[in-house]
């Protein structure tokens, strides 16, 4: 059965514009690709709009899928993932090897029940060494209205800042 990965293959590491302000994030992303679920889990990338977060997240997914087509990869925006409990449950039941969630700061706009469901999803993946990659417009400690137990988990792996590519 073919799963919709949500990936756009135009986003690759090869066409990611590397500079001083994003070298660490790229290096961490490549380490995740090579050590899926074992290194920097979760990988949390933050930066302002236009800094290349989505490009880097998509490149991770594309490279994992290219290297290991049998791996189950899902890229999804936080808005789509967190729109209701059923979507979270659907993603949880799919047993992805790599879950990439873009714009996780949206979690702060959701009620405790949705945050609880995401907490459970995160834990169910992490305990099985499934890789989680998150992006946000701010570092974990600056997330507004996100439960502290989630913020703690977001910092378990590697946190990397991207500076704008402009």
Residue spans for each PLM region:
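Conserved Walker B catalytic segment
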Residues: 105-128, 147-148
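Short regulatory helix/loop adjacent to the ATP-binding pocket of P-loop NTPases
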Residues: 140-156
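Structural recognition of the conserved hydrophobic beta-strand(s) that form the central parallel beta-sheet
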Residues: 75-76, 131-137
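AAA+/P-loop NTPase substrate/partner-engagement loops
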Residues: 25, 63-98, 107
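Dynamic helix-loop-helix/coil hinge segments at AAA+ ATPase domain boundaries and subdomain interfaces
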Residues: 3-26
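Walker A/P-loop nucleotide-binding motif
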Residues: 37-58
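Conserved AAA+ ATPase "SRH/arginine-finger" region at the nucleotide-binding site
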Residues: 157-166
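Walker B catalytic acidic pair
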Residues: 102-104, 137
């Amino acid at each position: 059965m073919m799963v919709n990965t949500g990936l756009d293959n135009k986003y690759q590491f090869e066409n990611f514009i590397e500079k001083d302000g994003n070298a660490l994030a790229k290096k961490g992303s490549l380490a995740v690709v090579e050590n899926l679920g074992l290194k920097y889990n979760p990988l949390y990338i933050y930066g302002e709009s236009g800094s290349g977060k989505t490009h880097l997240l998509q490149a991770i997914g594309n490279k994992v899928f290219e290297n290991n087509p049998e791996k189950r990869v899902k890229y999804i925006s936080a808005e789509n993932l967190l729109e209701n409990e059923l979507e979270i449950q659907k993603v949880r039941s799919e047993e992805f090897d790599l879950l990439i969630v873009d714009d996780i700061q949206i979690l702060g706009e959701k009620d405790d029940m949705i945050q609880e469901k995401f907490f459970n999803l995160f834990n169910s993946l992490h305990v099985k060494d499934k890789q989680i990659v998150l992006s946000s417009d701010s570092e974990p400690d600056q997330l507004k209205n996100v439960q502290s137990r989630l913020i703690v988990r977001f910092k378990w792996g590697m946190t990397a800042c991207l500076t704008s590519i402009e």
